[in-house]
A protein has these predicted regions:
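Acidic donor-binding segment of Leloir-type glycosyltransferases
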Residues: 1-33
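Short beta-strand segments
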Residues: 4-9, 57, 84-87, 180-193
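A structural signal for short, well-ordered beta-strand segments and their strand-loop junctions
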Residues: 31, 54-55, 81-86, 140, ...
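A short, glycine-/small-residue-rich helix N-cap motif at loop->alpha-helix starts
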Residues: 32-43, 63-64
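Active-site nucleotide-sugar/metal-binding loop of Leloir-type enzymes
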Residues: 42-52
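Short beta-strand-to-loop acidic/aromatic patch adjacent to the donor-nucleotide binding site
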Residues: 50-61
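Conserved catalytic core of nucleotide-sugar-dependent glycosyltransferases
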Residues: 67-154
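C-terminal catalytic/acceptor-binding lobe
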Residues: 138, 144, 148-248
Length: 248
């Protein structure tokens, strides 16, 4: 479904060893060592030929089968800025750490009997994921349009790429879409980068521990993770680790 390119940065020799192992494991994926984050991000975006683009971070999981036919591009004919894979009628919690809610707004229509459409502009004054059109957690955008917006501001991490983005730049596309149920979950169990949040409060596991396990052939076993009660875009899930597990 996606033509994948991974922009990565290893801060220690042990992390470099793990990335080397990962690169060998997935030879069909293009891995790009990060230098200048903004410049590298723009170059990666421009290197694609597809009309759309999506961004993911390393704690995103596509947990539900995702099937998109080419006609999904029709959504962009309806003033839609993005197709969100992280939103759906099931994502009723805004923040699992505080318990705040994010009820799906009134739907203005359903495009191609699949894509639920609403005006993010009408609810943008509320602090809710349904009123924020830009995310690095699996939103799909028109590629050339989003590249032109990246030239407007400075960013040096995925968090600042999202956090410093001015949503009013997308006012000319006042609508968002999602499918009935979300397909992607961000499970924040540890913290990468300089931004601070409450990651890892419930099922935290350190980067060092995950990396050490990976180098010892212990892997996250996604088949054993409980995805039965996804209620939030950012929701901690307990990771199940299997050692000496043969991948493919």
């Amino acid at each position: 479904l996606f033509n994948l390119k991974v922009l990565y940065h290893a801060t220690t020799e042990e992390y470099s060893k793990a990335y080397k192992k990962l690169i060998e494991r997935f030879p069909s994926v293009v891995f790009i060592k990060q230098g200048n984050f903004k410049q590298d991000t723009l170059e990666v975006c421009k290197s694609f030929s597809e009309p759309t683009i999506a961004f993911f971070v390393d704690d995103d999981i596509i947990y539900r089968k995702l099937e998109l036919q080419e006609d999904f591009l029709d959504i962009f004919k309806h003033g839609v800025c993005s197709l969100s894979l992280r939103l759906g009628s099931n994502t009723v919690i805004q923040d699992t750490h505080t318990g705040s809610r994010a009820i799906m707004p009134q739907v203005d229509g359903v495009i191609n009997d699949k894509f639920y459409c609403w005006s993010w502009k009408n609810i943008s004054q509320y602090h809710t994921n349904f009123g924020y059109p830009f995310s690095v957690d699996g939103n799909i955008y028109p590629r050339e349009e989003i590249i032109s917006l990246f030239d407007r501001y400075d960013f040096d991490t995925p968090n600042s790429l999202e956090g410093a983005f001015n949503k009013e730049w997308l006012s000319y596309r006042p609508n968002m879409t999602c499918m009935e149920l979300s397909c992607l979950i961000n499970t924040p169990l540890n913290l990468v980068g300089s931004s601070q949040n409450m990651a890892g409060k419930f099922f935290g596991i350190s980067l060092e521990e995950l990396n050490e396990k990976y180098l010892k052939d212990c892997y996250i076993d996604y088949d054993k993770i409980d995805f039965s009660n996804i209620m939030c875009c950012h929701q901690e899930l307990k990771m199940e680790i299997t050692c000496n597990f043969h991948l493919g």
